[in-house]
UniProtKB/Swiss-Prot annotation:
Catalytic activity from the UniProt record: urea + 2 H2O + H(+) = hydrogencarbonate + 2 NH4(+)
Statement: the UniProt record of this protein carries the keyword Electron transport: no
Modified residues (N6-carboxylysine): K220
PTM characteristics: Carboxylation allows a single lysine to coordinate two nickel ions.
Protein name according to UniProt: Urease subunit alpha
UniProt keyword annotation of tRNA-binding present: no
Complex formation: Heterotrimer of UreA (gamma), UreB (beta) and UreC (alpha) subunits. Three heterotrimers associate to form the active enzyme.
Gene behind the chain: ureC
Species lineage: Bacteria, Bacillati, Actinomycetota, Actinomycetes, Micrococcales
GO biological process: urea catabolic process
Active site: H323 (proton donor)
InterPro entries, per database record: Amidohydro-rel, Metal-dep_hydrolase_composite, Metal_Hydrolase, Urease_alpha_N_dom, Urease_alpha_subunit, Urease_asu, Urease_asu_c, Urease_Ni-bd
Family the entry assigns: Belongs to the metallo-dependent hydrolases superfamily. Urease alpha subunit family.
Species annotation: Micrococcus luteus (strain ATCC 4698 / DSM 20030 / JCM 1464 / CCM 169 / CCUG 5858 / IAM 1056 / NBRC 3333 / NCIMB 9278 / NCTC 2665 / VKM Ac-2230)
Length: 571
């Protein structure tokens, strides 16, 4: 016998279902549930008098060894590059093992995830689940960045640095074997996934190759060390030999060549371009043109995202500090001014919205904010919907699903693909490491409810530890048990080169964290960037800096009010 209830009542009990729309934070973006993998009338719900009890929704006979999951997240709406859908998510041995309908097949229909005695439950009713975010442009200057990143929904940090040295503040590089080994040992303490970039500067292969053998997952070419054609070519030769990525911050001053010369040095090989608009650094004024080519994997850093009335004004002073410039030297001031172009910044949001720019990242403490990768990505999406309307694929629908999938891909699956770690992280798919972030819809993209690493809860909003229940004020982010002791070894991954792992380096360094190799990078093209693989013709007018896509000018207006801002933060 069936029992009918209203959609509103159903959503209040079990969360939204197919056809329901969810507003994301205070934006104008609405996610519509495309599919519900649970069974109506057979929902698995935990609590007093609820379903998941002995002999009801829980099977009390099966032992863990037959495949009973360690954790089930019930009735949650997933927002991922793969789709926007409702499901139960099963985690076992730190990995996602099933997506579908959880419960007890002895008493319920349609069960493909068996909840057993060994199973913990997180209630996802009315909440949103995403993959953990990936920041590929991290200057490792302060360890406090890691807590800030976790509390924003990031679970993987890729970049370089050794602490607050001048070169680390500027160049996202961990140079040389000794520094790389020191940083790899430091990462043992943190419930965060890490990968290091070595110094991609040298006229011979050996000094760069030894950094890959020392555990770096790629090389960084940066103008502050000299982004010369020779360095670019040599770094890419090493990358091709070891199957790693090269990230590049090109030559703003055009001292060693123009954008055409950099493109010639790259010579069709895949490369990850940082802050491809140029305010963060790169050939002035036309670095943005590189994003049209299929071997270029272009990203933005978040200080220019979204374009606001304050963006240009804050950038000059920020740049002077980040790149060790002297405000009393006219040459240094001119260098800074050349990078800050209102016209290309105004085009950047549109290029992100069109799927021409594929990724977002932070440039943490070096002209970017590590805790705002997600916020600023979604602020761009909101600004573009307000200014450009629905994307063509979303026309005539009740929501913004195509745009939402495009933007969530920018900080999840696409950076994972770019750095050869997509078989481990970057999406909510069976077989992936269970790096998951749970959100209340009204706080989506701003403040996570719970951060899960490798199936373990590592960070979440919890109340007074002396409270009689978990919710009394003050409620703030606190570490959970997966962030302590030896649990960190299984809740987080250190990514290293295949060559270093084959040589036994993790054991030699005494590393205890889960180790994974990067791979499958050198054959990538922009077509591999999910929902963000467009390659139209791009041009920048050398005098006016106007940006054109297939001959048409692109720009947007600066925003003076943003969502996901003052409503959520005091400062």
């Amino acid at each position: 016998m069936s029992f009918e209830i209203s959609r509103e009542q159903y959503a209040s009990l079990y969360g939204p279902t197919t056809g329901d729309a969810i507003r994301l934070a205070d934006t104008e973006l609405f996610a519509v549930v495309e599919e519900d993998l649970t069974t109506p009338g057979e929902e698995a719900v935990f609590g007093g008098g609820k379903v998941i009890r002995d002999g009801m929704g829980q099977n009390s006979q099966l032992v863990r060894d037959v495949g009973v999951p360690d954790l089930v997240i019930t009735n949650v709406v997933v927002i991922d590059w793969t789709g926007i859908y409702k499901a139960d998510i099963a985690v076992r041995d730190a990995h996602i093992v099933a997506i579908g309908k959880a419960g007890n097949p002895h008493t319920m229909d349609g069960v493909d995830i068996v909840i057993g005695v060994a199973t913990d439950v997180i209630s996802g009713e009315g909440k949103i689940l995403t993959a953990g975010g990936i920041d590929t442009h991290v200057h490792f200057i302060s360890p406090d960045q890691i807590e800030t990143a976790l509390s924003s929904g990031l679970t993987t940090m890729i970049g370089g640095g050794t602490g607050p040295s001048e070169s680390s503040k500027a160049t996202t590089i961990t140079p040389g074997e000794w520094n790389i080994h020191t940083m790899l040992r430091s990462f043992e303490h943190w419930p965060m996934n890490f990968g290091l970039l070595g110094k991609g500067h040298g006229s011979s292969i050996s000094p760069m190759a030894e950094q890959i053998r020392a555990g770096a997952i790629g090389l960084k070419v940066h103008e502050d060390w000299g982004a010369t054609p020779s360095s670019i070519n040599t770094a890419l030769q090493v990358a091709d030999e070891y199957d790693v990525q090269v990230a590049i911050h090109t030559d703003t001053l055009n001292e060693s060549g123009f954008v055409e010369d950099t493109r010639a040095a790259i010579d069709g090989r895949v490369i990850h371009t940082f802050h491809t608009e140029g305010a963060g650094g790169g050939h002035a004024p036309d670095i943005i043109e590189l994003a049209q080519y299929p071997n270029i994997l272009p990203a933005s850093t978040n200080p220019t995202l979204p374009y606001t009335t304050n963006t240009v004004e804050e950038h000059v002073d920020m740049l002077m500090v980040a790149h060790h410039l002297n405000a009393d030297l006219p040459e240094d001031v001119a260098f800074a001014d050349s990078r800050i172009r209102q016209e290309t910044i105004a085009a950047e949001d549109v290029l992100q919205d069109m799927g021409i720019f594929s990724m977002t990242s932070s440039d943490s403490q070096a002209m970017g904010r590590v805790g705002e990768v997600l916020i600023r990505t979604w602020q761009v999406a909101d600004s573009m919907k307000r200014q450009r309307g629905p994307l063509p694929e979303d026309e005539g629908t009740a929501g913004d699903n195509h745009r939402i999938k495009r933007y969530v891909s920018k900080y999840t699956i696409n950076p994972a693909i770019a750095h050869g770690i997509a078989d481990s992280v970057g999406s909510v798919e069976v077989g992936k490491f269970a790096d998951l972030v749970l959100w209340e819809p009204q706080f989506f993209g701003v403040k996570p409810d719970l951060v899960i690493k490798g199936g373990q809860m590592v960070y979440g909003v919890v109340g007074d530890p002396n409270g009689s229940i978990p919710t009394p004020q003050p409620r703030w982010y606190r570490r959970s048990f997966g962030a302590y002791g030896q649990a960190v070894h299984t809740s987080a991954i250190t990514f290293m080169s295949e060559a270093s792992i084959r040589a036994g380096l993790p054991r030699a360094l005494g590393l205890q964290k889960t180790i994974r190799a990067v791979h499958g990078i050198r054959d990538l093209t922009k077509a591999d960037m999910r929902h963000n693989g467009e390659t139209p013709r791009l041009e920048v007018d050398p005098e006016t800096y106007e940006v054109r896509v297939d001959g048409e000018p692109v720009t947007c207006e600066p925003q003076d009010v943003l969502p996901m801002a003052q409503r959520y933060f005091l400062f």
